[in-house]
Each structure stands twice: as structure tokens, then as C-alpha cells.
């Protein structure tokens, strides 16, 4: 039987950014990226995104531990809006316009 700590180590942890309908950028953390984006678009995500739907997934980073992902989430939240836009624009691994996850 695996402990909760070991299970967490085998799980992917994501830091992500969403482009909201008002052109603001929301940054969050999750272990299930597709589910979390769907929750945001269904109005069941963070309070911030509820009135700014639909949201578009425009950037994500995958980490092996929760602590690393949450540390990166904090770092991203410290960036200015323009710095976030620049990071998204430099992200060569994402399709242009991001990925819209169906509601």
C-alpha cells in the first residue's frame, strides 16, 4: 500500500494560466488539468473566474510534486499582466490561441 506522500509523488501536478473573457489572466494549480478547466468554464472553479467565462487555457507547466507546482504558481502570480502575456507568447509548445476545453 502506498502512503499519501508516495501517491502524490507519482501524480502530475500542474500550474496553469487561463485567459478570461475580460482579457485578464488567472493562474492556478491542479492535479487534473482538463477537469479543472471544465470546472472553471462551468462556474464551479475559483470565484475570480465565475464572472469571467468562458476561459481559455493558454499555458500550463507540469511538475512531479505539489510543492514545486505551487511554488511556481506563486512565482507566476507575482508577474505583471504584460510579463504573463510575454511568457504565453514565448511558449512554443502550445497551439496559437491556446486550447479551449469543452464545457
Region spans (language model):
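GIY-YIG nuclease catalytic motif and its immediate N-terminal context
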Residues: 1-56, 60-62, 67-82, 88-103
Amino acid at each position: 500500500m502506498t502512503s499519501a506522500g508516495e501517491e502524490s509523488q507519482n501524480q502530475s501536478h500542474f500550474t496553469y494560466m487561463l485567459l478570461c473573457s475580460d482579457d485578464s489572466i488567472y493562474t492556478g494549480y491542479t492535479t487534473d488539468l482538463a477537469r479543472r478547466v471544465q470546472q472553471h468554464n462551468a462556474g464551479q472553479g475559483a470565484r475570480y473566474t465565475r464572472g469571467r467565462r468562458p476561459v481559455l487555457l493558454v499555458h500550463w507547466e507540469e511538475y512531479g510534486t505539489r510543492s514545486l507546482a505551487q511554488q511556481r504558481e506563486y512565482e507566476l502570480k507575482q508577474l505583471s499582466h504584460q510579463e504573463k502575456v510575454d511568457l504565453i507568447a514565448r511558449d512554443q509548445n502550445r497551439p496559437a490561441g491556446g486550447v479551449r476545453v469543452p464545457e
